[in-house]
Design a protein with these regions (language model features):
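Alpha-helical transmembrane segments in multi-pass membrane proteins
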Residues: 35-88, 106-115, 136-141, 145-146
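Membrane-interface helix/loop boundary segments of multi-pass membrane proteins
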Residues: 181-207, 234-240
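Juxtamembrane helix-loop-helix connectors linking adjacent transmembrane helices
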Residues: 49-57, 94-177
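Hydrophobic alpha-helical transmembrane segments
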Residues: 61-76, 148-177, 277-290
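Hydrophobic core of alpha-helical transmembrane segments in multi-pass integral membrane proteins
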Residues: 23-32, 78, 82, 113-117, ...
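C-terminal membrane module of polytopic membrane proteins
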Residues: 250-306
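Alpha-helical transmembrane segments and their helix-start/interface "positive-inside/aromatic belt" motifs
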Residues: 6-27, 97-116
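Functionally important transmembrane alpha-helices
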Residues: 213-275
Length: 306
């Protein structure tokens, strides 16, 4: 009996455990492979690589990290999602809901909704960053802060884009690859497994969103990422096409990358990270909430009309 037929009949629980194993093996394999690739391409001995990767201000280090990050994303999300879809169904395109295209109008409305949501996302992130754990968990909170600070240093280094070439590569690495891989894995596989396991699609959406947010290990952005994950799950539920959450995910990440590039090169005066924050931007925030809600309602209606 073909391997895919065996796993197609297994319980969601056993499928989930298999999924964890496939993800871990693939992530480690591709990270190691990309590490070997950079040592070969750049002629750097393996024993020197670890020390080099600590200096994120070094342009060569950034190139190495971007290659490794690209390989890691492919190995952690894209490859496991495709493999698991094959094992669980046999037709990955059907299982991941890639065959059905979302209506053009729903793509338009959802795209506009993601762009107008930026101030609202900034507010949620700001509120999340001000949350504190109880005093007895102070060591945990300090660890979370330290982890967040380290991640922020790397993110800031990645977003340093001196030329259009760096912008294009970041759009590929930060926007396109995650939009494909994370949606295939979390919405295409994980959400489906938890929906089958619980018998409730709502449980699948929120369980996948919870894991999606936790996976990023950025604790002070947990709430907005959780809500974003849930929204992406509902987009899949409403449309039956993974192309809609993929577009929304891409635009969310791409907007941040493009805004950072424009701000760095003084092509826009407003800092995109503070848009919607502060009492003087109340009207901007209000407009963001109203327009985002309106666009997503229109997107939902058009997605469900097909």
């Amino acid at each position: 009996m073909p391997l895919k037929s065996i796993w197609a009949q297994n319980t969601p629980y056993s499928k989930f455990l298999l999924g964890v194993g496939v993800i871990l093996i693939s992530a480690v394999a591709f990270t190691l492979l990309s590490t070997v690739v950079v040592t070969g391409l750049y002629g750097i001995p393996m024993y020197q690589l670890e020390n080099m990767l600590q200096d994120v201000k070094n342009p060569l280090t950034l190139q190495l990290l971007k290659v490794i990050q690209t390989g890691s994303t492919i190995g952690t999300f894209i490859v496991p999602a495709w493999v698991l879809a094959y094992l669980f169904h046999g037709d990955p395109k059907e299982y991941l809901q890639l065959r059905k295209l979302a209506p053009a109008k729903s793509l338009l409305w959802v795209g506009l909704g993601m762009l107008t949501a930026v101030p609202l996302i900034n507010l949620l992130g700001d509120l999340n960053s001000k949350m504190h754990l109880p005093s007895f968990l102070a060591p945990v909170e300090q660890w979370m802060r330290d982890s967040e600070d380290k991640a922020a240093v790397l993110t800031e280094a990645f977003l340093d884009m001196p030329d259009p070439g760096a912008l294009l590569f970041n759009l590929f690495m930060i926007a396109l690859l995650p939009a494909i891989g994370e949606e295939w894995l979390f919405r295409g596989v994980v959400q489906r497994l938890f929906s089958e396991w619980s018998g409730k699609k709502q449980v699948g959406i929120w369980a996948a969103a919870l894991l999606f947010s936790a996976m990023h290990l950025q604790f002070y952005g947990f709430v907005p990422r959780l809500l974003l994950g849930a929204l992406l799950g509902y987009l899949l539920l409403w449309s039956g096409s993974i192309w809609l959450p993929m577009l929304a995910h891409f635009l969310n990440n791409a907007a941040a990358v493009i805004a950072a590039y424009l701000y760095q090169h003084q092509l826009i005066s407003a800092n995109p990270d503070t848009l919607g924050l502060g009492p003087e931007q109340f009207m901007v925030l209000l407009a963001s909430i109203v327009l985002t809600a309106l666009f997503f309602v229109l997107g939902k209606r058009n997605a469900q009309s097909v």
